[in-house]
């Protein structure tokens, strides 16, 4: 009952006593004094309590009667009575008295009132024990106080706050989980009335509430926390201002002394926000201020707090308070690392609880995914993956893209987290399909990306990819049918690079299995020095295939010792790597070996971990005979149309083709698993299919696995032979090759079989029907290579009479004059395809013979050289198209390179033929350069080619296409590292060292560059700069480390060459001078790049006698062949642009029909000023621009390029001077063959212009030179100077032509130096030079 609601009595109650001056007690109650016993006192008090309980406010007489008693009960005797029951009964009486006498209290003294209420408050502690017999009376006391709001009378007291604080503390301390809701409600009523009806809440009172929200208190008494929470919710309107004042004092003014809770402000804000965000309406702006604090730790605390506020599930703070949200996002870029880390950790909860904020977070996470701190990049991945695992819809493609990027992070921990995270997503959404097809489609790229990582050099990456494949992409613990279905459709849906990576993975695992098998074989042999040396080498090889090869070596040695001592362990390992080991057996073996090596006393056993890595790599956990059978059944279902191909997102044709490709790859690594009639029957069915690729793969599988068909499966053999014969005679070229090899591999009577193919094919060759020639030529070539003893002689007549005389030396058809230097495979004419196969046949025939007794190799090399010199047009009848010539040049260069892999033929390849072959890497056709470089690298990296062929890569410095130069550099790095590693692993004699030590490439490179057709004048600075760039292209890679004083060794080689003569032309002084000049440039580069080359070389290098004569006695060559000025120019002058070769297929102007220089200023696509061309500095700039443009792409060019020049208008210029000028003579006399230095280019739209130009060209133009061009043209004698008129008509017939810099990009424009005299005169009179602008920009 509210005091204010009660009517005041007619007379004042205070001080009124009974008429006789004695205290009136209720009937039956005797006087209560200190003279009676406690029990008696309790008995009498109970009756008093009953009387007061039954009284109401309207009983005026009774109120008057019992007033003395009310005053008596408030005496010190009762308030300080030691008996708690007495105190409880008195408190109940007092509570009723306040109720009865409301709104006035019968007590006038403020001190007395304070004592009474403190007394009552102390009695409320009895509420704590609900099992107490007196609990009901305590509850009655609470109920009475709450109902009447008795404590509100204390507002009149000056120090009422002490009472309220004591009350609040008491109630919060006694509340517990045994109280029912009524107790809590009465407490709430009591406290809320004090808060809401008072003049304000003091800090101490507020502390008594807020302290219950602090985590430590919250954990001790959950009920007090709940009570405080409900109280705050109920009083939010009143208490909000008090809370705001508190936080303002602490956060803004820094007055932490205002409260003992100051150090818990952030915990309190979090709890208050969770209770009711309205409690903090005025506090949030203060947090924004704190986010910008100069103290990093303070910012960190605020970020932690706001992360919880923004990230909590029901929070709408981000939308309600955008300024604070934006300010918080800014902390993602905080300078303090822990703040950025905390921000990133928050993002995970935010993404999961507030997907609508993902857009805001994406940009900030993008920046943090590139954070310099490893921990932050790692946590970005964890954040995104955690959210994605909860629900893929929570993360957008961009966020997943950040994880994708981090799979290539420089730190292993980050890469591992990214890869494992993606793998888990793939398994969850693609393999298990937990969120439907749409989600599976969203992450379908993961499988490809993870497999692409197998291309990385790090062994850790490779091992993790293997683990991911075995556990996530195709889980090895699935049943065989399910596992193979998973693999079948995975393989069909992978992109080509991922397929290659997966194939490489199986290949590496198989190779490691073979290393372990060879190690076990060595254990079976008697101990010897050779055996120990071989075993050590094998252990080092195995260690390289494990993480941390340094530590792995020790562990592998230890494992090898255990193998030597434990025969049972060896047998387990032999079973594991046995071709017949099943997947289940493999699992048992791995567990058994691990159990034997485990040490119970050593919980972390790095040795065991390393052995497990090895076992996991070699164990056949996916493929066995049962698995192959399941794969074949799946493929059969696809053929029959009963498979789930479409449902799995793969077309039946793709499934069949990919399935067979998969089987083909597995036939290399697990051939034994294929040996069953059922499998071979299915493969025979594939052989009869119309799909050429399917049939080809089936033949390959027979070739790899069919060694026992003849003895074990005669029925399969009888069916297979006629099919193979038919494929060898009339199948595709690839089928024919595989069919011949298959017959040779699996049949004992192969001579008879091959003869039945050879004889009819050799008799039916007809050059007039080239489309029917290709397959027979492939079959004949491979037959002669596989069975040289039987077919070498009959093939000789075929080669002489048909291949060379009839096919290669005749052009039966006229090529399409489309101006392109390269055409797609399907557009190449059958005749040229036949000629390419004829060249390959010559090589295969010679590779089969492996001797040069008949001098056939010399004849073949001369033929191939002639083809290179004639640019692919061997007959020189000009009937063949440019693109066909490119094909034939590539075939000829590749053929020489192939023959060089056979020692007997390498010896007879002359330096001139080697140089011609080398210049193919500078061909004008981009695709020729590209394919030739790939073939060269492939042979070098397998150590099949002699070291001199690595020198060819030096010429790649002249390639204008950045990608080609980068590829060449990577090839050099790979080759050099492989050779050095091979030398480390295989100690060898000095003679063999000459062919492997990478530094020995220097003399070959020097000799090759000295004979470069572009190097015509040994003192020309531009030409020397080209030489320097080529030398540095190679030397930069060689000089990365100064291993074994290699810098001094290379310097010594160059010095020694100056003491010899060029073996190619020992008596030609000009040739030797060029050789010595290149040596001086090399010495200049080595000395300038290394301070370590002045020491003496520990070894005296041996120079190849094929290229250099023996040093003459007493011959001293200390002459410097480059001047000091030139030396300075080479080292400190403006760097020579790399772009000196055609990046695209833009041929040089050919004899016969020549390009025209159009001087009209009306043509579009030109912005070149003639003066610019004549200005050397402008020319250099234009070359650099052209070179840069080249790096943007590759395109095809026209056969007759048109150079379009826009001349700046000048007064008094005769219009006649702007007419079309035939640049034929200028081109022959003045265009440099410096692979693009001022070379003609087709402007944008030149394909259309060319047709018009062809119509305008005077067909009776200058006659073709009497002698055709051969190879590259040398640099013009007048390079860099004005063209001399008397040189214009001189034909240039020496060297292979190089591509032009103008070929660098489609529509590129260049400033050629082929200028007609009139244009030059015009340029001299023209206005000041304008800056040349590359149209590509």
Swiss-Prot record:
Note the CDD domains from the entry: PDS5 (cd19953)
Quick one: a GO cellular component term? plasma membrane
Quote the biased-composition stretches of kind Basic and acidic residues, using this chain's numbering.
1321-1337
Q: In which tissues is it expressed?
A: Highest level in colon. Low levels in lung, ovary, breast and kidney. Reduced level in renal tumor tissue. Isoform 2 is expressed in kidney.
Where are residues bearing Phosphothreonine located in the sequence?
1208
User: What coarse category fits the chief subcellular location reported for this protein?
Assistant: nucleus
InterPro entries in alphabetical order:
ARM-like, ARM-type_fold, Pds5
- Enumerate the residue ranges of region (Disordered): 1150-1337
Start-end of the HEAT repeats?
A: 393-429
Xref: Pfam families: PDS5
Q: Which family does it belong to?
A: Belongs to the PDS5 family.
- What is the protein's quaternary organization? Interacts with the cohesin complex. Interacts with WAPL (via FGF motifs) or CDCA5 (via the FGF motif); the interaction is direct, cohesin-dependent and competitive. Interacts with SMC3. Interacts with TP63.
What does this gene product do?
Answer: Probable regulator of sister chromatid cohesion in mitosis which may stabilize cohesin complex association with chromatin. May couple sister chromatid cohesion during mitosis to DNA replication. Cohesion ensures that chromosome partitioning is accurate in both meiotic and mitotic cells and plays an important role in DNA repair.
The miscellaneous remark of the record is:
HeLa cells with a reduced level of PDS5A show a mild defect in sister chromatid cohesion. HeLa cells with a reduced level of RAD21 show reduced association of PDS5A with chromatin.
**What name has this protein been given in UniProt?**
Sister chromatid cohesion protein PDS5 homolog A
Q: Name the gene for this chain.
A: PDS5A
């Amino acid at each position: 009952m509210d005091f204010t609601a009660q009517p005041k009595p007619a007379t004042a109650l205070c001080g009124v006593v009974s008429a006789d001056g004695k205290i009136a007690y209720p009937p039956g109650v005797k006087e209560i004094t200190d003279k009676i016993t406690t029990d008696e006192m309790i008995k009498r008090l109970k009756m008093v309590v009953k009387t007061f309980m039954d009284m109401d406010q309207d009983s005026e007489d009774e109120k008057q009667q019992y007033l003395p008693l009310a005053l008596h009960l408030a005496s010190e005797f009762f308030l300080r009575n030691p008996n708690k029951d007495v105190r409880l009964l008195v408190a109940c009486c007092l509570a009723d008295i306040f109720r009865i006498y409301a709104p006035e209290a019968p007590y006038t003294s403020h001190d007395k009132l304070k004592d009474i209420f403190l007394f009552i408050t102390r009695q409320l502690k009895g509420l704590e024990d609900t099992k107490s017999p007196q609990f009901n009376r305590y509850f009655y006391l609470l109920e009475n106080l709450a109902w009447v709001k008795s404590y509100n009378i204390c507002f009149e007291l000056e120090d009422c706050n002490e009472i309220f604080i004591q009350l609040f503390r008491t109630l919060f301390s006694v509340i517990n989980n045994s109280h029912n809701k009524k107790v809590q409600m009465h407490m709430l009523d009591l406290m809320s009335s004090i808060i809401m009806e008072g003049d304000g809440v003091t800090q101490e009172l507020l502390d008594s509430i807020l302290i219950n929200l602090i985590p430590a208190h919250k954990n001790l008494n959950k009920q007090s926390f709940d009570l405080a929470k409900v109280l705050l919710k109920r009083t939010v309107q009143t208490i909000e201002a008090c809370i705001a004042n508190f936080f303002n004092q602490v956060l803004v003014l820094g007055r932490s002394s205002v409260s003992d809770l100051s150090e818990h402000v952030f915990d309190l804000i979090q709890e208050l926000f969770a209770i009711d965000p309205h409690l903090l309406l005025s506090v949030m702006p203060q947090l924004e201020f704190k986010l910008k604090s100069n103290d990093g730790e303070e910012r960190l605390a605020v970020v932690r707090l706001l992360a919880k506020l923004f990230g909590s599930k029901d929070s709408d703070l981000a939308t309600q308070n955008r300024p604070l949200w934006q300010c918080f996002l800014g902390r993602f870029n905080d300078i303090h690392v822990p703040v950025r880390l905390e921000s990133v950790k928050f993002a995970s909860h935010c993404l999961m609880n507030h997907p609508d904020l993902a857009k805001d977070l994406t940009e900030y996470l993008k920046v943090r995914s590139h954070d310099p701190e490893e921990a932050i990049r790692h946590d970005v991945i964890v954040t995104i993956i955690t959210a994605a695992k909860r629900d893929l819809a929570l993360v957008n493609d961009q966020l997943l893209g950040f994880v994708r990027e981090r799979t290539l992070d420089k730190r292993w921990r980050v890469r591992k987290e990214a890869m494992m995270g993606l793998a888990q997503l793939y398994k969850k959404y693609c393999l298990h399909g937990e969120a439907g097809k749409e989600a599976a489609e969203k992450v379908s790229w993961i499988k490809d990306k993870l497999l692409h990582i197998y291309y990385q050099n790090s062994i850790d990456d490779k091992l993790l990819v293997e683990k991911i494949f075995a556990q996530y992409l195709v889980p090895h613990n699935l049943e065989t049918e399910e596992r193979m279905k998973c693999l079948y459709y995975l393989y069909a849906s992978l992109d080509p690079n991922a397929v290659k990576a997966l194939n490489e993975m199986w290949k590496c695992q198989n190779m490691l299995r073979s290393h372990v098998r060879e190690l076990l074989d060595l254990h079976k042999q008697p101990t010897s020095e050779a055996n120990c040396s071989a075993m050590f080498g094998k252990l080092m090889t195995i260690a390289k295939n494990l993480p941390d090869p340094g530590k792995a070596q020790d562990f592998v040695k230890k494992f090898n010792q255990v193998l030597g001592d434990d025969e049972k362990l060896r047998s387990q390992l032999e079973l594991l790597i046995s071709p017949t080991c099943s997947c289940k057996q493999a699992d048992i073996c791995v567990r058994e070996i691990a159990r034997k090596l485990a040490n119970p006393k050593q919980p972390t056993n790095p040795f065991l971990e390393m052995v497990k890595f090895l076992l996991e790599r070699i164990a056949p956990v996916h493929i066995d005979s049962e698995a192959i059978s399941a794969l074949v059944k799946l493929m059969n279902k696809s053929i029959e149309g009963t498979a789930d191909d479409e449902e799995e997102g793969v077309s039946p044709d793709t499934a069949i083709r990919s399935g067979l490709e998969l089987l083909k790859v597995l036939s290399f690594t697990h051939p034994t698993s294929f040996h069953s009639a059922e499998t071979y029957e299915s493969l025979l069915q594939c052989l009869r299919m119309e799909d050429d690729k399917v049939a080809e793969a089936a033949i390959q599988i027979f070739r790899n696995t069919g060694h026992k068909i003849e003895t074990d499966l005669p029925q399969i053999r009888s069916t297979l032979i006629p099919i193979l014969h038919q494929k060898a005679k009339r199948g595709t070229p690839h089928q024919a090759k595989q069919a011949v090899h298959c017959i040779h591999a699996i049949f004992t009577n192969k001579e008879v079989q091959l003869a039945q193919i050879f004889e009819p094919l050799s008799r039916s060759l007809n050059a007039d029907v080239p489309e029917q020639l290709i397959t027979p030529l492939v079959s004949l070539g491979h037959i002669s290579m596989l069975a040289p003893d039987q077919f070498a002689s009959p093939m000789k007549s075929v080669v002489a009479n048909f291949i060379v005389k009839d096919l290669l030396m005749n052009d039966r058809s006229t090529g399409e004059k489309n101006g392109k230097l390269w055409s797609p495979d399907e557009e190449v004419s059958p005749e040229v395809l036949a000629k390419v196969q004829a060249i390959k046949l010559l090589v295969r025939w010679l590779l089969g013979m492996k001797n040069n007794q008949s001098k056939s190799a010399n004849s073949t090399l001369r033929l191939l050289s002639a083809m290179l010199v004639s640019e692919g047009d061997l007959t020189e009848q000009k009937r063949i198209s440019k693109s066909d010539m490119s094909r034939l040049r590539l075939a000829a260069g590749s053929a020489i390179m192939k023959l060089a892999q056979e020692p007997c033929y390498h010896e007879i390849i002359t330096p001139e033929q080697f140089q011609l072959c080398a210049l193919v890497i500078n061909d004008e056709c981009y695709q020729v350069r590209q394919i030739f470089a790939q073939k060269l690298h492939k042979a070098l990296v397998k150590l099949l080619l002699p070291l001199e062929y690595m020198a060819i890569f030096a010429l790649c410095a002249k390639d204008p296409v950045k990608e080609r130069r980068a590829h060449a550099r990577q090839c050099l790095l790979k080759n050099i590292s492989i050779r050095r590693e091979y030398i480390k692993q295989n100690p060898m004699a000095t003679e063999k060292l000459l062919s492997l030590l990478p530094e020995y490439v220097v003399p070959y490179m020097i000799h090759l560059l000295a004979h470069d057709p572009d190097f015509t004048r040994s003192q020309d600075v531009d030409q020397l700069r080209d030489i320097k760039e080529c030398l540095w292209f190679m030397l930069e890679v060689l000089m990365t480390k100064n291993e074994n004083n290699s810098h001094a060794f290379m310097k010594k080689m160059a010095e020694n060459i100056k003491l010899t003569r060029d073996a190619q032309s020992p008596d030609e002084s000009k040739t030797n001078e060029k050789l010595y000049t290149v040596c001086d440039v090399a010495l200049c580069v080595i000395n300038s790049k290394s301070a370590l080359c002045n020491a003496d070389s520990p070894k005296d290098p041996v120079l190849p006698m094929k290229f250099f004569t023996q040093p003459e006695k007493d011959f001293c060559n200390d002459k410097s062949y480059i001047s000091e000025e030139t030396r300075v120019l080479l080292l400190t002058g403006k760097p020579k642009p790399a772009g000196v070769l055609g990046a695209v297929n833009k041929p040089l102007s050919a004899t016969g029909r020549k390009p025209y220089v159009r001087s009209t200023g009306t043509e579009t696509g030109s912005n070149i000023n003639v003066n610019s061309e004549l200005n050397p500095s402008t020319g250099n700039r234009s070359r650099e621009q052209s070179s840069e443009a080249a790096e943007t792409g590759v395109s095809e060019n026209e056969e007759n390029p048109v150079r379009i020049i826009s001349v700046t208008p000048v007064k008094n210029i005769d219009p006649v001077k702007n007419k079309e000028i035939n640049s034929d003579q200028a081109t022959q006399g003045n265009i440099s063959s410096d692979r693009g230095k001022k070379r003609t280019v087709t402007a944008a739209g030149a394909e259309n212009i060319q047709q018009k130009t062809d119509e305008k060209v005077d067909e009776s133009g200058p006659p073709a030179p009497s002698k055709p061009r051969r190879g590259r043209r040398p640099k013009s004698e007048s390079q860099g100077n004005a063209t001399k008129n008397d040189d214009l008509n001189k034909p240039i017939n020496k060297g292979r032509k190089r591509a032009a810099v103008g070929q660098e990009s489609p529509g590129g424009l260049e400033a050629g130096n082929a200028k007609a005299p009139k244009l030059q005169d015009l340029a001299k009179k023209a206005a000041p030079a304008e800056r040349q602008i590359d149209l590509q920009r």
